[in-house]
């Protein structure tokens, strides 16, 4: 893989390992702790269907290099959208300005150590996994399926995207690493209407594999067909929904995608930069009980073919499974190289960046809660009056206070231990640690989301995974309209 990526990114400009060592030498007489080069090629393609016709098709290709130098807590960063010696030299001259001139102690490595991690996905180009005709056929199949599912379907929108990336990382700590990253996603949105009332449903999936995955047959149906039917089902549920109640009440969260609440309310607060700056609710709490003892939460970038998985992170560190909270006790934070060094701990393979034009920072990969021991039916049976929320929409969280607001996209009343009427307009309002300490039951099956997650932080978006088993929160504020 290293040879293939080098041939793509370096060979066309006659760049060699020795040439790149010389780039580090430009910065070597400054008081710099660490420096790295991040080369990237990306190709992305998307198709959009609306009203039964292809409304949009796009293709974009980009390549460039980011140059970073770190001195203490200061970072110098420059990037170029051309990969050549002159651009690298200009970037290196720019970033070294963050540090004082010093004598000796060159930071430039004498040689690189090639990182040979376990591959977490196949090194394929998903743009080439289906012909243009088959990609369009897939979107039309989704459209036909959704419309045939129910006469109340009035509008179907679907998008199909695929991304191919090659990255190469070189650093003054001797790191030399490369990765080839495929990524695909199918997104479906359906609008239904009855007696003047309109509601929407959505579904989607994806991961690090080829587009042909959507044509595979599972449980007697093509995957894309199943996703289209699920979008219609969700829309029809909301069409018959009544107004959600409001107030303090028990809530049962479904398995899988509702883990997005965990991601936002807990996950971001466990990223190393927030804790180094003491701006997280979890700062200084390692070894303390921060959630219910029923909760064990991990961030695992090693799961094969998952959207949030990485063979290496964007600093060349192999991904790993990090236990963040075990039996309710905080174990540690997610780290990149800079924050790990400043905090005196090891990096965890969580250094991520949107592209060569962005700085790396601690980010999640696939963050989820492990299974418990309760049966799902027992969770529902234990609630006299409350809400069951199997699907979430958007949400937001304040990292410092831990307070969050999340809207449900599908929810039901629980009455006398049984799931009854669907409800609309339910929002969950609370504080991360407080809510996590009120988890009293955790189901015995954990699920990951379908592969649609995108996480934003400081203007950067990266693909992520979330997940959890179904779980019961004894008391949380539900914002509703009734």
UniProtKB/Swiss-Prot annotation:
Q: Which InterPro entries match?
A: Metalloprtase-TldD/E_C (IPR045569), Metalloprtase-TldD/E_cen_dom (IPR045570), Metalloprtase-TldD/E_N (IPR002510), Peptidase_U62_metallo (IPR051463), TldD (IPR025502), TldD/PmbA_N (IPR035068), TldD/PmbA_sf (IPR036059)
Highest taxon of the lineage: Bacteria
Q: Which GO terms describe its molecular function?
A: metallopeptidase activity
Lipid biosynthesis among the record's keywords?
Answer: no
Top EC class per UniProt? hydrolase
Q: List the disulfide bonds.
A: none
Keywords tagged on the record = Hydrolase, Metalloprotease, Protease
What are the coiled-coil residue ranges?
A: none
User: Which EC number applies?
Assistant: 3.4.-.-
User: What is the role of the protein in this entry?
Assistant: Probable metalloprotease.
Q: Which family does it belong to?
A: Belongs to the peptidase U62 family.
Name this protein carries in UniProt: Metalloprotease TldD homolog
Q: Which organism's genome codes for this protein?
A: Haemophilus influenzae (strain ATCC 51907 / DSM 11121 / KW20 / Rd)
């Amino acid at each position: 893989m290293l040879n293939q990526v080098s041939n793509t990114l370096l060979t066309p400009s006659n760049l060699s390992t020795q040439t790149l060592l010389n780039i580090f030498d430009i910065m070597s007489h400054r008081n710099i702790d660490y420096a790295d080069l991040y080369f990237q090629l990306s190709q992305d393609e998307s198709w959009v269907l609306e009203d039964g016709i292809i409304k949009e098709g796009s293709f974009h290709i980009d390549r460039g290099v980011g140059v970073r130098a770190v001195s203490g807590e200061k970072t110098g960063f420059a990037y170029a959208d051309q990969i050549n010696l002159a651009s690298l030299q200009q970037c290196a001259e720019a970033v070294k300005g963050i540090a004082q001139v010093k004598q000796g102690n060159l930071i430039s490595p004498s040689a690189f150590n090639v990182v040979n991690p376990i591959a977490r996905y196949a090194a394929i180009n998903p743009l080439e996994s289906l012909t243009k005709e088959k990609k369009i056929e897939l979107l039309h199949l989704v459209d036909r399926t959704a419309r045939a599912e129910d006469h109340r379907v009035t509008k179907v929108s679907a998008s199909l995207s695929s991304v191919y990336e090659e990255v190469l990382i070189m650093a003054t700590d001797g790191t030399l690493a490369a990765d080839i990253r495929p990524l695909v996603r199918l997104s479906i949105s359906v609008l239904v209407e009855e007696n003047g009332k309109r509601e929407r449903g959505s579904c989607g999936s994806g991961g690090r594999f080829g587009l042909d995955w959507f044509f595979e047959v599972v449980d007697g149906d093509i995957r894309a067909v199943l996703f289209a039917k699920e979008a219609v089902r969700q829309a029809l549920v909301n069409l018959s929904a009544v107004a959600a109640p409001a107030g303090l009440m028990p809530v049962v969260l479904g398995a899988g995608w509702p883990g997005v609440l965990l991601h936002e309310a807990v996950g971001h607060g466990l990223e190393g930069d927030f804790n180094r700056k003491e701006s997280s609710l979890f700062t200084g709490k390692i070894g303390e009980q921060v959630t219910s003892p029923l909760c064990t939460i991990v961030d695992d970038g090693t799961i094969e073919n998952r959207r949030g998985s990485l063979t290496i992170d964007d600093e060349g560190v192999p991904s790993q499974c990090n236990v963040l909270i075990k039996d309710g006790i905080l174990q540690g934070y997610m780290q990149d190289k800079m924050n790990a060094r400043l905090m005196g701990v090891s990096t965890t393979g969580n250094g991520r960046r949107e592209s060569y034009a962005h700085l790396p920072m601690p980010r999640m990969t696939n963050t989820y809660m492990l299974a418990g021991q309760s049966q799902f039916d027992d969770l529902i049976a234990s609630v006299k009056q409350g809400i069951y929320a199997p699907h979430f929409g958007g949400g937001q969280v304040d990292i410092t206070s831990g307070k969050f607001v999340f809207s449900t996209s599908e929810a039901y009343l629980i009455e006398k231990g049984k799931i009854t009427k669907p409800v609309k307009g339910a929002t969950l309002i609370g504080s991360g640690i407080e809510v996590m300490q009120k988890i009293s039951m955790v189901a015995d099956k954990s699920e990951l989301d379908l592969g649609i997650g995108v996480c934003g932080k400081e203007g950067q978006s990266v693909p992520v995974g979330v997940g959890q088993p179904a779980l019961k929160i004894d008391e949380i504020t539900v914002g509703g309209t009734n």
